[in-house]
């Protein structure tokens, strides 16, 4: 339908629906507003503001892919429509596509130089984009060792005045190597580890907003990183015959919500398994506590506490939405190193779980046909197989396309 084909009656109906949608939006009823804006668009698809208004609702409900699509539609109708560029920039920024978001914010500042909000958004996006580009350039110029290989726990004793929960200690046998890499005799060492008493202790310690000694943080991260790297990218899950499995969505640093889940639903145990489906950090003020508790539970119940990686378990999102700042604030002396170590652990997280060969759990969503291994083969059906996910390379940051990207970022969008 073109603008000329829209009757006065249809236009009047569309405007009435828009007013209803605006009222719903003002009442924070975003899903209901989306429905009304959709009806308005169906009545009169020629008005770009209908699309950008719906895009704003999608942004509030974290439907960033749909928001970008609506912004694209608005700009197809009117390439000069400033709100189209702004909404698309916000959606792209939320999806971590900084280069594209930066270009759209710049376009808004050119077309509306007096828009202070747009100038501020562009400055923030530009600063973050340049910072990440600089860090990536440094990383590509040197053979950077993994942070996990550089941490020497002997340098981080538990402070004498520390009065919180303490890790248990066990004897382990390890092989030592010379500088030339030759194996030496096996040696017995003390190793701290996570037991139920420690998990119970840090649960209350964090509830009272106290921090762990950096030594214990390093121990948890080093041990969980070693554990996670042994797992496939797609983990098969069996529910205990005498127990249950609870699947939970985004917790985003809301530590007290996590405690409430365990209070109402039961704490993780050998018979009560949990699967948390990504986005553990950012936005909330206690992302570090959530992550340390989850990693501690993973060490305590390696076959009963499961963690999927989400799109917020990545560098760009953590720099944009708060986790990096939180880590640096709570551990100022070790903040940069600790944040990098968290990123290594995030990269080791599996991206999907298959429950009882029946239920597929992934943070992002299903996959585009172009992502399938056989997509370019003659007769290929464009369907991603589970074995492709099991063999997926995941020990890196998500790119703009591919299996890892879509496992974390595949927002539902309308198909033409």
Enumerate the predicted regions with their spans:
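Feature recognizes metal-dependent phosphohydrolase scaffolds
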Residues: 106, 123-416
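Alpha-helical tetratricopeptide repeat
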Residues: 1-148
């Amino acid at each position: 339908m073109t603008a000329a084909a829209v009757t006065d009656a249809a236009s009047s109906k569309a405007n009435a629906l828009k007013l209803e949608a605006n009222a719903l939006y003002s009442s924070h009823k975003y899903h209901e507003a989306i429905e009304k804006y959709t009806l308005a668009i169906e009545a009169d698809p020629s008005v770009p503001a209908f699309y950008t208004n719906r895009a704003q609702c999608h942004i509030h409900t974290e439907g960033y892919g749909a928001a970008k699509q609506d912004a694209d539609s608005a700009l197809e109708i009117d390439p000069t429509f400033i709100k189209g560029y702004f909404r698309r920039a916000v959606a792209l920024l939320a999806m971590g596509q900084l280069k594209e978001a930066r270009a759209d914010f710049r376009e808004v500042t050119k077309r509306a130089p007096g828009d202070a909000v747009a100038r501020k958004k562009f400055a923030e996006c530009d600063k973050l984009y340049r910072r990440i580009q600089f860090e990536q350039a440094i990383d590509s110029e040197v053979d950077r060792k993994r942070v996990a290989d550089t941490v020497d726990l002997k340098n981080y004793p538990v402070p004498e005045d520390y009065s919180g929960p303490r890790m248990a200690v066990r004897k382990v046998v390890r092989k030592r190597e010379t500088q030339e890499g030759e194996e030496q005799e096996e040696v017995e060492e003390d190793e701290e580890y996570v037991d139920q008493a420690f998990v119970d202790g840090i649960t209350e310690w964090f509830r009272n907003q106290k921090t762990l000694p950096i030594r214990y943080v390093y121990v948890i991260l080093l041990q969980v990183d070693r554990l996670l790297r042994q797992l496939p990218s797609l983990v098969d899950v069996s529910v205990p015959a005498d127990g249950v499995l609870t699947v939970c969505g985004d917790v985003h640093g809301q530590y007290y919500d996590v405690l409430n889940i365990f209070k109402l639903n039961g704490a993780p145990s050998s018979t009560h398994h949990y699967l948390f489906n990504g986005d553990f950090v950012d936005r909330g003020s206690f992302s570090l506590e959530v992550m340390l508790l989850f990693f501690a539970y993973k060490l305590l119940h390696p076959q009963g506490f499961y963690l999927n990686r989400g799109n917020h378990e990545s560098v760009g999102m953590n720099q944009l939405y708060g986790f990096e700042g939180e880590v640096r604030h709570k551990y100022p002396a070790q903040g940069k190193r600790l944040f990098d170590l968290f990123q290594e652990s995030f990269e080791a997280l599996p991206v999907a779980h298959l429950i009882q060969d029946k239920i597929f759990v992934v943070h992002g969503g299903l996959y585009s046909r172009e992502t399938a291994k056989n997509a370019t083969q003659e007769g290929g059906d464009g369907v991603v197989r589970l074995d492709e996910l099991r063999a997926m390379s995941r020990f890196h940051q998500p790119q703009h396309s591919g299996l890892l990207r879509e496992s974390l970022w595949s927002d539902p969008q309308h198909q033409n």
